[in-house]
Amino acid sequence: MEPEKLIETLAVAERLKDATRHCYTSRGRRESVAEHSWRITLMAYLVSDEFPEANLEKLMKMCLIHDLGEAFTGDIPTFEKSEKDEEKEASLLNEWMMQLPEPFVSEMQELYREMEERKTLEARIYKALDNLEALIQHNESDISTRSEERRVGKE
């Protein structure tokens, strides 16, 4: 990737550092989408010995890119995300991806297709880790944040 395009791409990814999720860290601050993506990628690496038949590189790529669309829309909690929200996020993400050079466009499109269909082992593991990380994070946060989490999306 050309240096200028790399910097542009990283600038979009940087937005995920400021995109907060609906849950809190154990220290009482809102978790970012970037932190969530980093942790499920680490989880993929740490459980890889349990799935020797899985392609670890593909799995880690899925974990890294799974929430890139939220760089454009922010995090909308799953329990509040509508079909219209999903379509908007997918459209904006696709528009951005089409500006990337090959082989990144094709590879990312294939990874997103696999993640959506959840037919491959890697896609099923990624989705399980995505859900598990959220459960772990909720359990690590103070119980007093639970009612706040429900109010956040209604503001």
Regions found by a protein language model. Give the residues of each.
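Alpha-helical scaffolds flanking conserved acidic
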Residues: E53-I65, E122-Y126
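Helix-adjacent hinge/juxtasegments
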Residues: N55, L68-S106
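Conserved small/polar residues in nucleotide/adenosyl-binding loops
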Residues: E149-E155
